[in-house]
Amino acid sequence: MNWLLVVAGGMIGAPLRYLTDRAVQSRHDSVFPWGTFTVNVIGSVVLGLLTGAALAGAVGSDLRLLLGTGLCGALTTYSTFSYETLRLTETGARLHAAVNVGGSVAAGLVAAFAGVTLADALWA
């Protein structure tokens, strides 16, 4: 049964990633991978919120599997982040690559912290 929850969440997260990535990237005339950056930050805040809610006892394991492992796992993408960073480096956009690495890690951490903090304010 657990794997079905993960699959169901992934069936929502994967198309959301694709559609969000395309929508965001189409609005930026830049080599910087704004779409991937956006989905990773959104996923970090959602996972932070879910984790904070779980720590407060407001969410059960089924919802964590559905939204945390399934939805957030499919929404976020470390492999695309890595590939796009490599491509930036290979095409000479080394500054963009460095900003992508530093900015993605920093923004992801801030987003996760914000999600946990929001959950703490809502459920603690």
UniProtKB/Swiss-Prot annotation:
GO biological process per UniProt: cellular detoxification of fluoride; fluoride transmembrane transport
The record's subcellular location field reads: Cell membrane
Identify the GO cellular component terms for this protein: plasma membrane
- Principal localisation: membrane
Reply yes or no: does the keyword Transport apply. Answer: yes
Q: Which reaction does it catalyse?
A: fluoride(in) = fluoride(out)
Where are the membrane-spanning stretches?
39-59, 63-82, 98-118
Q: Which PANTHER family match?
A: FLUORIDE EXPORT PROTEIN 1-RELATED (PTHR28259:SF1)
* HAMAP family cross-referenced by the UniProt entry: FluC
Protein purpose: Fluoride-specific ion channel. Important for reducing fluoride concentration in the cell, thus reducing its toxicity.
Which protein are we looking at?
Fluoride-specific ion channel FluC 2
Lineage of producing organism = Bacteria, Bacillati, Actinomycetota, Actinomycetes, Kitasatosporales
Gene (name only): fluC2
